[in-house]
Amino acid sequence: MIQVQTRLKVADNSGGIKAMCIKVLGGSKRRYANIGDVIKVSIKEVVPRGKVKKGDVYDAVVVRTAHGVRRSDGSRIRFDSNAIVLLNTKREPIGTRIFGPVTRELRSAQFMKIVSLAPEVL
């Protein structure tokens, strides 16, 4: 579960390394975001010559959480860290590669581009 002030890893090659959640989108009093939800993030750490700059604000989709996701068959998938993929204004990924696995829940959340770029879908 992601909330405001949560530090996240950037799981694409857009140039960001770390980001911080500044808003959970989808309702005025919404507090938590899970896998597949869109949040607003501020970039905190970048690689040199990347597409994004420190301090920039972007939309991002949550692809991995330490809290995990529960499936209808009763299983639960958890990850070691919280990770996001940065999105542009058209809700398309900024990067051209995704690092690490993503879950099937992104497929139902209309993020097929991210699912197709990911090296592994759990």
Curated annotation (Swiss-Prot):
The keyword DNA-binding does not apply. GO terms for molecular function: large ribosomal subunit rRNA binding; structural constituent of ribosome. Keywords: Ribonucleoprotein, Ribosomal protein, RNA-binding, rRNA-binding. GO terms for biological process: translation. GO terms for cellular component: cytosolic large ribosomal subunit. InterPro entries: Ribosomal_uL14 (IPR000218), Ribosomal_uL14_bac-type (IPR005745), Ribosomal_uL14_CS (IPR019972), Ribosomal_uL14_sf (IPR036853). SUPFAM superfamilies: Ribosomal protein L14 (SSF50193). Binds to 23S rRNA. Forms part of two intersubunit bridges in the 70S ribosome. Part of the 50S ribosomal subunit. Forms a cluster with proteins L3 and L19. In the 70S ribosome, L14 and L19 interact and together make contacts with the 16S rRNA in bridges B5 and B8. Belongs to the universal ribosomal protein uL14 family. This is Large ribosomal subunit protein uL14. It comes from Vesicomyosocius okutanii subsp. Calyptogena okutanii (strain HA). The lineage of its organism: Bacteria, Pseudomonadati, Pseudomonadota, Gammaproteobacteria, Candidatus Pseudothioglobaceae. The gene is rplN.
